[in-house]
């Protein structure tokens, strides 16, 4: 299961809850990345970018060795779909969507590892960055499998999402 959406759209919160509801392991790119920061240190934006790419590689390696998992990441639309399809099996996408202003508000309010470099930006810069990302954001990854869009503007009930996912998860995997 692939959880996608804008930064601060509620991906990690929903992914954790779905993994628990479904009894699946959670592979969270931020957890991997923060572990790399702890081991290798916090640096500038170029360092962050390098560790982020390494974190992506670790995430995909773990996913390739895991039969059934919830994957949480800020996916790159240029590269992620092909890499995800290479994993094989059923790719069910859960797309988290929320208002860009709310995403900017959440982004500014959240506390993350210092390696993410979030606090180096003013609230205005964060709002502008999220608005630019949203304006150019292509939406769901559209991996060719089932897609469930979830409005994450308000609190989401994981049990309700799990019920909506049940028929998507139960459908047979078609070759090809």
Task: Name each region found by the language model.
Residues 50-91, 96-97:
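Glycine-rich phosphate-binding loop used to anchor ATP phosphates in small-molecule kinases
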Residues 166-176:
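C-terminal accessory "lid"/substrate-recognition subdomains
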Residues 6:
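P-loop (Walker A) phosphate-binding loop of NTP-binding proteins
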Residues 13-65:
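Conserved substrate/cofactor phosphate-moiety recognition/catalytic segment
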Residues 112-161:
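Small-molecule kinase domains that catalyze NTP-dependent phosphoryl transfer to phosphate-bearing small molecules
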Residues 100-107, 158:
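Switch/connector loops and helix/strand junctions flanking conserved nucleotide-binding motifs
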Residues 3:
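Hydrophobic anchor at the beta1->P-loop junction of P-loop NTPases
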Residues 10:
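Conserved glycine(s) of the Walker
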């Amino acid at each position: 299961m692939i959880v996608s959406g804008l930064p601060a759209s509620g991906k990690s919160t929903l992914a954790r809850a779905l993994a628990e509801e479904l009894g699946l392991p959670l592979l969270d790119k931020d957890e991997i990345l923060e572990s790399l920061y702890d081991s290798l240190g916090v640096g500038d934006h170029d360092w962050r970018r390098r560790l982020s790419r390494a974190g992506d590689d670790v995430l995909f390696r773990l996913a390739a060795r895991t039969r059934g998992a919830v994957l949480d990441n800020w996916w790159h639309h240029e590269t992620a779909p092909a890499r995800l399809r290479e994993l094989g099996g059923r790719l069910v996408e859960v797309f988290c969507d929320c208002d860009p202003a709310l995403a900017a508000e959440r982004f500014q309010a959240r506390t993350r590892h210092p390696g993410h470099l979030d606090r180096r930006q003013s609230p205005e810069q964060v709002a502008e960055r999220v608005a630019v990302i949203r304006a150019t954001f292509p939406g769901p990854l559209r991996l060719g499998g089932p897609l469930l869009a979830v409005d994450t503007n308000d609190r989401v009930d994981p049990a309700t999402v799990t019920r909506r996912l049940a028929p998507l998860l139960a459908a047979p995997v078609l070759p090809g």
